[in-house]
C-alpha cells in the first residue's frame, strides 16, 4: 500500500513537470513570434523612413537645375561682343542700301509700264494739267516709293538670315542707342559751317569708327562754343 501511494505521487509529479515544461516552451515560442514581428515592423518602418527623403532631394535637384539654367541663358544673351555687333549692324545697313536698287528699278518699271502706256486725250486736262505730266508724276512717285521701301525689305531679309541672334541684336541695339543719345551733340547749335556729325550714328560699323564718332562730337562742341574755329 505505501508503495502504491509513492508510485502515484511520482506519476503526479512527473506529469506536473512535463506540463510546466510545455507551458514554458509555449510562452517562449510566443515571445519569439512577437519579437520577430516587432523586428519585421521596425525594418519596414526603417525602410519607409529611408525612402521618404528621396522625393525632396529630387525636387531640390530639379530646382537647382532650373535656377542654374537662368544664369546660362543670361550668359548666352551677353555672348555677342560689341565688335561683332557693330559688324552685323554694318552688314544690316548695307543690305538695306543694296536692296534699294532693285526695289527702285522694279517700282519705276512697273509704274512706267502702266502709266506711260495709257491712251490719253490731250484735250482732257486734269486739274488744268496735261495728262502726260500727270502720268509722269505718278511714275516718279511710284519710283520714289520703291526707293523708300528698299531698306525695309533689305532689313527684313537680313533679319530672316540672322534669326538665331535676334534677341542679342535687339538688346545690343537698345544699349547702342542709349550710348548714342548720351554722347551726341545738341542739334540746335548746328550751322552751315558746322553741321551735326552723324546724329543717329548710322555710319558706325566698328569700335574704331565709334571712337572717331566721339571725337567728331567733341569737335562739334568745341566749334559751337568757340565761334566755329578750325579744329586742330
From Swiss-Prot:
The record's Gene Ontology biological-process terms are: protein import into mitochondrial matrix
Mention any one GO cellular component term assigned to this protein in its UniProt record.
Answer: PAM complex, Tim23 associated import motor
State the superkingdom. Answer: Eukaryota
Q: Indicate how the chain sits in the lipid bilayer.
A: Multi-pass membrane protein
Disulfide linkages recorded for this protein, renumbered to the chain, are none
Q: Where are the transmembrane segments?
A: 96-116, 140-160
Q: Where is the transit peptide?
A: 1-40
Intracellular or extracellular location(s): Mitochondrion inner membrane
What are the entry keywords?
Membrane, Mitochondrion, Mitochondrion inner membrane, Protein transport, Transit peptide, Translocation, Transmembrane, Transmembrane helix, Transport
Q: Which PANTHER family match?
A: PRESEQUENCE TRANSLOCATED-ASSOCIATED MOTOR SUBUNIT PAM17, MITOCHONDRIAL
So what does this one do? Component of the PAM complex, a complex required for the translocation of transit peptide-containing proteins from the inner membrane into the mitochondrial matrix in an ATP-dependent manner.
How the protein assembles, per its UniProt entry?
Component of the PAM complex, at least composed of mtHsp70 (SSC1), MGE1, TIM44, PAM16, PAM17 and PAM18.
UniProt family annotation: Belongs to the PAM17 family.
Protein known as: Presequence translocated-associated motor subunit PAM17, mitochondrial
Amino acid at each position: 500500500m505505501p508503495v502504491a501511494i509513492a508510485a502515484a505521487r511520482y506519476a503526479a509529479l512527473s506529469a506536473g513537470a512535463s506540463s510546466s515544461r510545455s507551458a514554458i516552451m509555449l510562452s517562449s515560442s510566443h515571445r519569439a513570434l512577437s519579437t520577430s514581428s516587432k523586428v519585421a515592423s521596425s525594418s519596414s518602418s526603417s525602410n519607409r523612413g529611408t525612402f521618404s527623403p528621396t522625393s525632396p532631394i529630387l525636387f531640390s535637384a530639379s530646382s537647382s537645375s532650373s535656377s542654374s539654367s537662368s544664369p546660362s541663358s543670361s550668359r548666352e544673351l551677353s555672348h555677342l561682343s560689341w565688335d561683332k555687333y557693330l559688324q552685323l549692324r554694318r552688314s544690316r545697313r548695307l543690305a538695306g542700301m543694296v536692296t534699294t536698287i532693285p526695289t527702285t528699278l522694279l517700282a519705276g518699271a512697273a509704274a512706267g509700264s502702266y502709266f506711260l502706256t495709257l491712251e490719253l486725250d490731250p484735250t482732257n486736262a486734269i486739274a488744268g494739267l496735261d495728262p502726260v505730266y500727270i502720268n509722269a508724276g505718278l511714275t516718279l512717285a511710284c519710283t520714289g516709293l520703291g526707293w523708300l521701301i528698299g531698306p525695309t525689305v533689305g532689313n527684313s531679309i537680313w533679319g530672316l538670315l540672322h534669326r538665331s541672334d535676334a534677341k542679342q541684336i535687339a538688346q545690343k541695339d537698345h544699349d547702342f542707342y542709349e550710348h548714342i543719345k548720351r554722347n551726341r551733340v545738341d542739334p540746335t547749335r548746328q550751322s552751315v559751317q558746322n553741321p551735326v556729325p552723324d546724329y543717329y550714328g548710322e555710319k558706325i560699323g566698328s569700335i574704331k569708327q565709334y571712337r572717331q564718332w566721339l571725337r567728331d562730337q567733341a569737335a562739334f562742341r568745341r566749334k559751337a562754343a568757340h565761334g566755329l574755329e578750325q579744329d586742330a
